[in-house]
Amino acid sequence: MVKTQRVVITPGEPAGIGPDLVVQLAQREWPVELVVCADATLLTDRAAMLGLPLTLRPYSPNSPAQPQTTGTLTLLPVALRESVTAGQLAIENGHYVVETLARACDGCLNGEFAALITGPVHKGVINDASIPFTGHTEFFEERSQAKKVVMMLATEELRVALATTHLPLRDIADAITPALLHEVIAILHHDLRTKFGIAEPRILVCGLNPHAGEGGHMGTEEIDTIIPVLDELRAQGMKLNGPLPADTLFQPKYLDNADAVLAMYHDQGLPVLKYQGFGRGVNITLGLPFIRTSVDHGTALELAGRGEADVGSFITALNLAIKMIVNTQ
């Protein structure tokens, strides 16, 4: 890394394990400065509950970034709307969560931060606060005015991107259009090159239907839509293999010769990845004008403040963001 960079972290739902995990991140040195967008009392109280040392340093955007030392975090303060009891949701704090996301996103857009790492949010309490919220991915897409974003989850061994994300099954076939596939594959290919440092990405593409349509006998989306798009993109030089049946694609003879898998919908690709690496996975938003990674788990309200939460996914998300920063320099 040419110079020390700043990354911004949002702990997510304040009543969940996000603050616990951020405090745990502070228990080691990092080659980047960790700027946490959060309420100061929330972090110090949670550190006290966990019995872990924590010193909060004020965020100074005009000072050079410094590597984070053990037991410290840099604080970008955002005030809670209501006091927090670990494990108990408070509707007004839905506004607080969105404020942290907005400030962190804006800081990435204006060049303050080299990457954003997000902790788990509780979508229900945000919506209960009368804030329409589908998820981090859609929020950052809208706020950054990105043309299109792609959700990808990754472990050390496997990367799975999604052509569609949070759609009912009955709507997916209609959503898989040539325009969508062109856009999604272009973003996936571009970010594998620029953010992951893969010169010629090799992408496996799932079919939509069982057995990838069985030659048109179990659906024609492969013949009508997916195959023509893949043929066009191969002619442009992309290394694409598919459409392949999703039930046989996830095995070494295919995965050993690929850099990523493109699944057509959420529950086609993610169960395999989460079974293979749950707790070690990272959610990456491709297509944003900045680097964004996230944990692959939820708020685990029942574990908040108990010292039982596994920080592994957050560490993996932060380490991956650091690697991506290096690749883009």
UniProtKB/Swiss-Prot annotation:
GO MF annotations, alphabetized: 4-hydroxythreonine-4-phosphate dehydrogenase activity; cobalt ion binding; magnesium ion binding; NAD binding; zinc ion binding
Reaction it catalyzes: 4-(phosphooxy)-L-threonine + NAD(+) = 3-amino-2-oxopropyl phosphate + CO2 + NADH
Compartments it resides in: Cytoplasm
Known pathway: Cofactor biosynthesis; pyridoxine 5'-phosphate biosynthesis; pyridoxine 5'-phosphate from D-erythrose 4-phosphate: step 4/5
Cofactor descriptive note: Binds 1 divalent metal cation per subunit. Can use ions such as Zn(2+), Mg(2+) or Co(2+).
Catalytic EC class: oxidoreductase
Required co-factors: Zn(2+); Mg(2+); Co(2+)
Pfam families linked: PdxA
EC number(s) per entry: 1.1.1.262
PANTHER family for the chain: 4-HYDROXYTHREONINE-4-PHOSPHATE DEHYDROGENASE
UniProt protein name: 4-hydroxythreonine-4-phosphate dehydrogenase
